Amino acid sequence: MAHDVFNLADLPAKKEYYRGGETIVVEAEPSDGWYVLLSGKVGVYKKDFSVAEISKPGTVIGELGFLLNIPRTATLIAQESTLLMHVHITLDDLLTNYPAVVKHMIKILAERVVKTTEDWRDSMEKVSLF
């Protein structure tokens, strides 16, 4: 049975609330699942440098460590009062029982690749002007 990614009630997950400035996960620590942003804003940091801010409800966060079974690739810090759904599931269970969620995650990853490529191209164009 396919589940809509925005109908999170059936996923093995729990809501977690963070105050502004509170750390959600720390880069290089073990990954214990992934998150869906319900409300608020999350800052993404790599080695203490801000690399992104996420504020769109429904955005999947922390999926790389989960999908690749590697430690966290970034630190996440709530930028304001933030509500997340913390999902605890095995990859096999996700693939078998929640294909709509998997499709959503693939779309997000593809969009991030496009944005990263565009940002890189823009930065290279700026460098070539000098």
PLM features: what roles do these ranges have?
Residues 10-11, 29-31, 48:
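Short, small/polar residue-rich loop motifs at catalytic or cofactor-binding pockets
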Residues 4, 91-130:
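A small-molecule sensor/coupling module
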Residues 32-43, 47, 57-59:
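Glycine- and acidic-residue-biased ligand/ion/polar-headgroup-sensing regions
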Residues 18-20, 24-29:
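Short phosphate-coordinating micro-motif centered on Lys-Gly-acidic
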Residues 1-20:
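Cyclic nucleotide-binding regulatory module and flanking cytosolic helices
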Residues 11, 53-106:
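Cyclic-nucleotide recognition modules
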Residues 19-20, 38-39, 56, 80:
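A cytosolic small-molecule/anion-sensing beta-strand core signal
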